[in-house]
Amino acid sequence: WFNRTSENGVSFYNPYESWTYSTKTLPMYNTKTPYTELAYFGTIFANAQKESDNLHILTTQNIFTELNFTSENDRFGGDGIMQSEKNTNKSIVTSFNYLGKRYMMHTGYIHNKVIRKENGGTSDNSMVRDTTLDAREYPINLNNASTDLIRNTFFLDQQYRIPFTFIRNIKDRKIDKAFKDSLLASGDTARIDSLDVFLARRRAAREAADTLGDNNITTAFIGHSSEYSVFRKTYADQITDAAGKAFYNDVFNYNPTTSFDSVRVMKLENRVFLRLQPWSDDAIVSKLNGGIGNR
């Protein structure tokens, strides 16, 4: 837990990253037929004060062979163990991805909202040791406090593949020329008469070949990646009782009964990169990368 890494680099949002998606973890789909998931799971037989309920809705389909659309809605919620621990975590995701022979693109929108009640812990630690008490009976420091977190992310990743087919074409022309020269030198008139047809078939086969999966050709990739994210956290409370005032050492600089604090982080990233694959993708030197960006 303490060694976890942050996808977004926003400290107050780190604990919630595993409950939603990032631009790196958002799954992209490619389906032959429309696909939908509906799921509900929770502790339906638990006490109503402590039950949790979770909802998952996913739908995805290919608009065209290369273009896919996906929408997902997730909700995680629970009332907690002690008083004022109710928590709701909602995520809404919309994404498109395009997978062509030369061009590839991923784009989407990620929305995450967390509404969390705050109790400040129990005001009497000795009651925790009393096993006859239910956790709901523990006195708490804050009776009317909450924290809201909202995150909105727009992202676009795209790249264009440029296979250096001219190198292979030069090799193929040399092979064709060598075959033609050897055949002419043999003097076989029947095979010489069909030479043009044979070479035409070879050229047609090469032109019709799908180079998307050809990993053994020198290739360049030009790509662009961008992300715009806004993270906002707000804390609000109303404190009129002695326990709540003691929790904050009775220090209220602006309002003696009400607090409202907020923080906002905006992240804008743009990156352009160039990747060169000199030989095959599993060679000793498989990729050479370079790029620039701003954040």
Regions found by a protein language model. Give the residues of each.
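Transmembrane beta-barrel strands of outer-membrane/channel proteins
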Residues: L38-G42, N73-R75, T107-H111, I222-R232, ...
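Transmembrane beta-strand segments of Gram-negative outer membrane beta-barrel proteins
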Residues: S6-S11, L26-I44, F69, A220-Y228, ...
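Short loop/turn motifs that connect adjacent beta-strands in outer-membrane beta-barrel proteins
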Residues: L26-T33, T65-E66, R102, P163-I222, ...
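Residues on the lipid-exposed face of transmembrane beta-strands in outer-membrane beta-barrel proteins
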Residues: L38, I57-Q61, T94-G100, L156-I162, ...
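Outer-membrane beta-barrel translocator/channel fold
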Residues: I81-S91, S95-F154, R161
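Extracytoplasmic loops and strand-loop junctions of Gram-negative outer membrane beta-barrel proteins
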Residues: W19-T20, A39, F76-G78, A135-N144, ...
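Surface-exposed loop/turn segments flanking beta-strands in extracellular/periplasmic regions
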Residues: T122-A135, Q238-T258
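Outer-membrane beta-barrel translocator/receptor signature
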Residues: E17-S22, Y29-G80, N87-I92
